[in-house]
């Protein structure tokens, strides 16, 4: 009787440990997904800002060309 109770206890501990590991893995994957989404959003914002800066440079170059050579 005692042995079967100990075996049942060990089984419960192993199941609990497995559940903890699964929960940790799930949390890890969710955190990675959030970080990846934030990275994509930040990259998109940087690309938009770079595009604006490139347009500003083109306008400034056109201004300089007109000022010095126009």
Curated annotation (Swiss-Prot):
This is Uncharacterized protein TP_0535. It comes from Treponema pallidum (strain Nichols).
């Amino acid at each position: 009787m005692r042995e079967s109770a100990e075996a049942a206890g060990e089984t419960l501990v192993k199941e609990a440990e497995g559940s903890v590991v699964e929960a940790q893995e799930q949390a890890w994957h969710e955190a990675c997904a959030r970080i990846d989404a934030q990275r994509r959003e930040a990259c998109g914002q940087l690309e938009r800002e770079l595009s604006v800066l490139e347009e500003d440079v083109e306008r400034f170059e056109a201004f300089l060309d007109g000022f010095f050579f126009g």
